[in-house]
């Protein structure tokens, strides 16, 4: 690995109200970049890796230093351009333009493969930004906890009469994304057994209370699960092992979980999925010396993993892909029926997307947890009738450990995002919170992604692969005045399989911020309603009508009906 990708340095975002940059609009991206590399947040901060295999915040340490310098100098009418983690230009724009525009990992379609990307990465010409790593709005595992919780709750409604009490979830992966699974299962009322091949990840999840217990052996794990489900307790158990070994063994034993999924980093066979029989150190070494052979070995293990998932599905166990592209990897290794079980979005989440509901998140730049608790109360006050959301916020406060700057996520839609943003901005203006708040979201949202094996799988009109939508989302957020906007490729499912956009907006308490918030936090979720209405989803059309969206072709179609 080039020296510039490794530095023994501890980075933490500044706290409080003293500015390093020239305004809060440039201080915010600076703090969030640093927060992504906080050792309590990032998986491997010394190599700039935030989460998801090799999802980085900056291309190398020289680029990181240059980004920090540029942000501290940036004027109120300038925009910094980031190309795959490298600051390439500062241009005069205007005070309502984004302060930062980011493009990460984008390749011309024919060349959008891991092989070509890895060549560019080795030459220092590219950076994998994942979704929120390179767009500087990662908040640790909390960022996916509620989405996973909502998925498990909906699965309980569909398959088990509305409750997961006395049930258990079998899954794997305790990295930045997968680490949310055991806590989400517990919050949804279920037990869980999560397989993870790195002891350090299990230790971190135990320390932060995302996992309750670790079992010493598979027999021990199953005994614990049997006891807890019989007692009706929701307890999460981790086992240090390889999922490609454990899932087939469970099938052979005739063990029957109640839900099966997976969140290993299968999207990246070179860095994210340990081949069966290998040690992690051996995997890292071979990734450098024999990348092709390493990828093939990882994908062979994924094939065994997916065959076991297919076997569970054939038993009648609800089984679903949680968006890591493991089915595609298995299919490439000859598992022709890999897609016989669905992805989580078409199975459980799409009705939410039709209403523009998705992972709305915010961060207290002050570093004071009390600011988040005050915003929690404000959300309850504004979204007064949503008791399910209130329950989530109560559980989040009780169980979720803040990583880095205090943050919160809650899934809300078009109807509420603008109202919440304006309320937060007013809290900053009147001093109810001690410093500005940034509002962002995952790129996994209703109108910001094209990913045929994940968010846009099995679209009603067959438009799964059409990536005009995330491009339009990024353009509209730029025109609307988001503080920073990002457009990435390959997040979640790997090179060649997705394109997606993100936005972040700062609530600094000013009237100008309020005007930007009105535009951005309406237009951003509205693109999700638009995208699904255009695809023919009645729920999205109804939402568009209720919210007064101007969708010419949808209106014309409705008129003909």
Swiss-Prot record:
Organism taxonomic ancestry: Bacteria, Pseudomonadati, Pseudomonadota, Gammaproteobacteria, Enterobacterales
Keyword Thylakoid among record annotations: no
Predominant place of localization: cytoplasm
Pathway: Amino-acid degradation; L-histidine degradation into L-glutamate; N-formimidoyl-L-glutamate from L-histidine: step 2/3
Organism of origin: Salmonella gallinarum (strain 287/91 / NCTC 13346)
Residues reported to bind NAD(+): 52-53, 130, 176-178, 196, 201, 242-243, 263-267, 273-274, 322, 492
Gene3D superfamilies: Urocanase like domains (3.40.50.10730), Urocanase superfamily (3.40.1770.10)
A Pfam match: Urocanase
The protein's name: Urocanate hydratase
Enzyme class: lyase
